[in-house]
């Protein structure tokens, strides 16, 4: 998925932008944000099902560099997320399980079949330049923002990216058409050669999946 550059500005604790701070400052920001999102534990949210959407597929390759296709990487991470969630007893629906094309409306329609569901769309990023790197989490709506905050904080913690941000995207049809809380996670830039090599490793893919699952569980547990 192509990216647009985002300004590095101060935002609320539930919307975090990281632009390569020194390590102690980075840890302080992350710790404070975790504290804010976890203060006031309430009854767990009722989540009946997690919809895992592996971005692109079939004729839609997504971002690509050489023989590295976003659609393939997204599906690998999606399968890992599914496996981890099922191990926790959480029902999961995949929007696709193979290299097939599904429209954005079709993906949202799958999610909209269920009540008390959440929707996680998994992607990898690219840009015309080769220097951009990091993880990004997009959301739409208030509950989407809360879900994005939990997932993104775990992405920062597990992956330790150089850059990362969360922001609302009103131009992403798959999020707007989904009635349940929905986010889109960009797991790394395959247009950056160093980051692309990391994205291709099973260890990085597993850490992406663990971060997403940890974030889902935190969202489920904390208001």
For each of these PLM feature ranges, what is it?
Residues 27-37:
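Bacterial N-terminal signal peptides
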Residues 7-29:
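Bacterial N-terminal signal peptides that target proteins for export
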Residues 48-67:
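Short glycine-rich His-centered loop
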Residues 45-49, 68, 72-223:
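Active-site-proximal helix/loop segments of hydrolytic enzymes
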């Amino acid at each position: 998925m192509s990216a647009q550059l985002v300004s590095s500005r101060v935002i609320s604790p539930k919307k975090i932008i990281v632009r390569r701070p020194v390590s102690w400052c980075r840890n302080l920001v992350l710790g404070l944000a975790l504290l804010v999102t976890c203060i006031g534990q309430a009854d767990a949210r009722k989540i009946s099902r997690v919809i895992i959407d592996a971005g692109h597929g079939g004729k839609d390759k997504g971002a690509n560099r050489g023989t590295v296709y976003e659609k393939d990487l997204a599906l690998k991470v999606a399968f890992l997320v599914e496996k981890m969630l099922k191990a926790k007893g959480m029902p999961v629906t995949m929007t696709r399980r193979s290299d097939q094309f599904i429209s954005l409306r079709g993906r949202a329609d799958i999610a909209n079949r269920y009540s008390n569901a959440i929707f996680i769309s998994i992607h990898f990023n690219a840009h015309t330049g080769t220097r951009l790197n990091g993880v990004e989490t997009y959301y739409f709506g208030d509950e989407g923002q809360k879900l994005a905050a939990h997932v993104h904080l775990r992405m920062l913690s597990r992956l330790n990216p150089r850059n990362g941000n969360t922001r609302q995207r009103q131009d992403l049809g798959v999020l707007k058409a989904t009635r349940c809380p929905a986010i889109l996670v960009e797991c790394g830039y395959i247009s950056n050669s160093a980051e692309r090599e990391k994205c291709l490793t099973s260890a990085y893919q597993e850490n992406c999946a663990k971060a997403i699952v940890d974030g889902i569980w935190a969202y489920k547990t904390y208001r």
